[in-house]
């Protein structure tokens, strides 16, 4: 956590050491890791502000959420995480990344969210029929703190190719068609809402 002033100078910070775990063939963090990490970072920040300036922060002019780009968090209609968070370190999406790269004529890295979703569909994973939306770690934290499905354009660029402040429309249609042929009928704009609501 970093606190800056109105001239963008850092005036305090807080941190927590954490490391992802390799479980069941997947690099992951648990929701408890995520929630506890945020709380610990903020507590450390607040205590550092108190130590340096003699006060605890009570309000802020603005806040921003930044986390590791890419990865895959799939949720059902009740906001339940369907499979453990798959971080950017995972290299289980080679087939999907290759097929999407060929389909779009645009390099899709294995770590991108769309590659993870596409691979889950290819693998006919049990959770796929229950997906209501997907998100990244930063998008998830933003949703938890603000109840809004939004990601910045930088974060969005690790989900699906972007153009301007949205996802590249000419790539959406062939991707949706290919997914539909494999039984996944959601539109990309619906998974998550942040596909079309970028900050």
Q: What name fits each language-model region?
A:
Residues 1-83, 98, 130, 181-190:
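N-terminal glycine/serine-rich phosphate-binding loop of ATP-dependent small-molecule kinases
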Residues 86:
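Acidic, His- and aromatic-enriched active-site or binding-groove loops in soluble protein domains
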Residues 90:
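Carbohydrate-associated surface elements
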Residues 93:
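Gly/Ser-rich phosphate-binding catalytic loop and adjacent alpha/beta segment
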Residues 101:
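Phosphate- and other anionic-substrate recognition elements at nucleic-acid/protein interfaces
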Residues 104-198:
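Gly/Ser/Thr-rich active-site cleft segment
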